[in-house]
């Protein structure tokens, strides 16, 4: 099994969610996140004072799925989240050893 974590721009969430549904993914976890990379921050003026905003708002999308579905999901996320500008985000892929559904005790792919 694979865990795919994608850090994307918040306004791209609906497009990513729809793309994941189109490739047959049934569940996702979404978390608000803040961060910066090459995009860095920017300065804002608030009540006459200039502030540096280091961390930019992002959204983290997480999915766990069968190995054979990983490439389709990665492509769906990449195509839906891409704007071609700095700050589009990152996709991280890692192996998952086990999944357990708390309610039933099911394990492995049955628990996803």
From Swiss-Prot:
UniProt keywords, alphabetically: Nitrogen fixation, Nucleotide-binding, Phosphoprotein, Transcription, Transcription regulation
Keyword Transcription regulation listed: yes
The name this protein goes by in its record: Nitrogen regulatory protein P-II
Annotated positions of the O-UMP-tyrosine modification: 51
Annotated Gene Ontology cellular component terms: cytosol
Gene3D superfamilies in alphabetical order: 3.30.70.120
GO molecular function, one term: ATP binding
GO process terms (BP): nitrogen fixation; regulation of nitrogen utilization
Function noted in UniProt: In nitrogen-limiting conditions, when the ratio of Gln to 2-ketoglutarate decreases, P-II is uridylylated to P-II-UMP. P-II-UMP allows the deadenylation of glutamine synthetase (GS), thus activating the enzyme. Conversely, in nitrogen excess P-II is deuridylated and promotes the adenylation of GS. P-II indirectly controls the transcription of the GS gene (glnA). P-II prevents NR-II-catalyzed conversion of NR-I to NR-I-phosphate, the transcriptional activator of glnA. When P-II is uridylylated to P-II-UMP, these events are reversed.
Family: Belongs to the P(II) protein family.
SMART domains (alphabetical): P-II
Description of how the protein assembles with itself and partners: Homotrimer.
């Amino acid at each position: 099994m694979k865990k795919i974590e994608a850090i994307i721009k918040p306004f791209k969430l609906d497009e990513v969610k729809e793309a994941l549904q189109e490739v047959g993914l049934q569940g996702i976890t979404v978390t608000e996140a803040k961060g910066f990379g090459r995009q860095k921050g920017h300065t804002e003026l608030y009540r006459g004072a200039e502030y540096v905003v280091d961390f930019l708002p992002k959204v983290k999308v997480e999915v766990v799925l069968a190995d054979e579905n990983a490439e389709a999901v990665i492509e769906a996320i990449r195509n839906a989240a891409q704007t071609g500008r700095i700050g589009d985000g990152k996709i991280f892929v890692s192996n998952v050893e086990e999944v357990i559904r708390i309610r039933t005790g099911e394990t492995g792919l049955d628990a996803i």
